[in-house]
Amino acid sequence: RPKKCIFVENLIDNAMYIRKIDKLLLDWKNYEDRKPLVVRGCRQCGKTSTVISFAKKHYKNVIYLDFHKEKELCTIFSGSLNVDYLVVLISAAIPSARFEEGKTCLIFDEIQECPHARASLKFFKLDGRYDVICTGSLLGINGYSTIDSDAFIPVGFESAINMYPMDFEEWLWANGIQDSVIDILKHHLEEETPVPQAIHNSMRQLLLQYIVVGGMPDAVKTFLATHDINRVLTVQRNIIEGYKADMVKYANPTDKNRIRECFESIPRQLSKENKKFSYSVVRKGARSRDYIGSLQWIEDAGMIHRCYNLNITELPLSGNAIQDSFKVFMADTGLFISLLDEGTQFDILHGKLYGYKGAIYENIVADILGKMGRKLYYFHKTDGIEIDFVFRYKGECTPLECKARTGNAKSLNTLLRHPEKYHVNNAIKVGDYNVGRAGSVLTIPLYMGFLLTAL
């Protein structure tokens, strides 16, 4: 019989952070005809602690099964998936488990490790007495497994939501910034008026720290407890090593080296003047057909955001994307900075974001937009026009330029002078300055990027 599960209280960090996914979890629970829920995301983005904390707040009984640490638990699901039968086996394995209709939540952690448990979600849905929340790494959930897990996916009997590392707004909450301060920022964005200098300086400093620390909860926790960047860097590098361990665990043997080469090329890709992803930077003479699957693997792991070039700046953006022309950004700014040269953190904390040919600026914008769940696009033409990002904002196709220093944006001006050709009427520049407007161009400080949510 499986040994007793770790008691659930031991898995919750006392210093829990407010996460935006909490609202999605509550919306799910309040939906009468809810299905078992799968929370998927990259490794160590806070899935387990968030789900356990939520369940303990909203259910009388929480039953936790970790299929990664206690693989014997999978034997519970190796036979009949009848819910009454499973209740008997789970109760035997976990004597503290209590099953009460409408008051019990089962948490299946690392569900990709036990495909039969995932298959049981259909039966829990049809039974309807107990809620089930699962967590899963993107790799396993997307079918990268040593076993044929696709056959066990209960199509139509589960819901899924994505979870990301902490974004800048969650970082502000973790640092004790109240919503009243964020409301002030929103007001100045809407009115297009400068943020008061004291708030501006504070937000700017918090952003510099966020660029270095990023949103991985362990890195955030370490920084807030110690303010020791070297300790934060150790945490970040351990997370990176965990990703590399996943490459060994999940990837086909023939792909492992190629995946690692693709991943390790990202800083070199972004430090180029032209940041379009080039397979020859991965390895001299490399061809796209040899590496395209490896890059997809990294994307499916939640480690990167792909940013596609556009044929034309016109909605819908997805219909105008060039599939074989793209940039690759790290999904979390802190992990990206941890891959750069020693001392980069020191430079950033002192306001020096100009290095790597603008890569730090572009990657933080990719971090901000990507953690909103947005797809990323840019615009680059052979005639010299290049726009860092293009996104839908307030119903319009909107170019977004990120500038480390103030200056004329020639490409932006070209687009705005020819709306009949480029379908652009307004643009946004983010950089190290306050809110302002010059004609059709709204300038905002980089720390305000998280407020650009309007579709």
Regions found by a protein language model. Give the residues of each.
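Short glycine-rich substrate-engagement loop in P-loop NTPases that contacts/grips substrate
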Residues: E70-G102
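N-terminal pre-Walker A segment at the start of P-loop NTPase domains
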Residues: K3-N30
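Interdomain motor-coupling "hinge/lid" segment immediately C-terminal to the ATP-binding subdomain
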Residues: G143-S271
